[in-house]
Amino acid sequence: MPVNDGRGDGERGGLGDANSREAVLSAEGLTKSFGKRQAVADVSFELFAGEVFGFLGPNGAGKTTTIRMLVGLARPDRGRVRIGGFDLARDFARAMAHVGSIVESPDLYGYLTGRENLLHFARMLPDGAQGRIAELARLVALEERLDDRVETYSLGMRQRLGIAQALLGAPDLLVLDEPANGLDPAGIREIRRLVRQLAAERGIAVFVSSHLLSEVEQMCDRVTIIHRGRALATGPVQELLDRSSSGATRWRVKPAARAAELLIPFAADQPEVEGEESVIARVAREKLPEAVAALVREGIEIFAVEPRAGSLEEVFLDVTGGETV
């Protein structure tokens, strides 16, 4: 959704600079109810230039409602949104002039070609948007199909055209609602590449909502986990992954079942057998030599003891009390 105007070229304020630490997007205490149902409750986060920020949660968690508040399609009951330094409620046009977005699905006309769709939306924007069409078509790898009707495009091609459309206004902030939803693995990989490129090479702040744990893990720098309308965890992806592993080690041993029994006195919780030759156990570093010696004494073959990387799935299960995405 390219958004028209409210600023001249001199009002961008350098927000496309990936080294700037001024927040491109700031959400403070966002709360929204529909009747007696509270869809979003006191959600806060910041997003910086050149960063991919993941908003992770299951369907119905409050992701789309939050996005609608971020782009002015819904008014929060409480809280505020600032974009490019402008308060969204008080200075809507100037705030939204910094934003390109796809909410739920790209707004495209199937009977028009890709080029005609981009021209249609470019005409709503300040001078210069039409001149970016060829460049954006190359960026999203659609230059060879730009003059074909959109109704002939695959879902992934439509999604990439939607991203090109959202970039027509040269935004500092790109908001994408479930951009990989329904795509095949190749399509998901292409969206991931494009999003990372926009952040790294153009300094665009990218907000991505998703329920795909592995994709958020690979695509995003930081993430907020939202569940039942509440933000349960926020932080750098790697920091959350490190927290989820919390000292867990993978023991490549044989036989695994017997090794798991022997590790019980050294482990912080019940060791978990993974197959015939693998055990996951949380053993403190200072106890590792003693644990290894105990296994060797009992004739256990030890092939390796290595730190076990965490996953966003484990983080999600931990903060939600075991509920799945």
Model regions and ranges:
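ABC transporter nucleotide-binding domain
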Residues: 192-282
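Short, charged/small-residue-rich alpha-helical element at the C-terminal edge
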Residues: 246-319, 325
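ABC-family P-loop ATPase nucleotide-binding domain
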Residues: 1-31, 322-325
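ABC transporter nucleotide-binding domains
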Residues: 22-27, 32-208, 213-227, 232-233
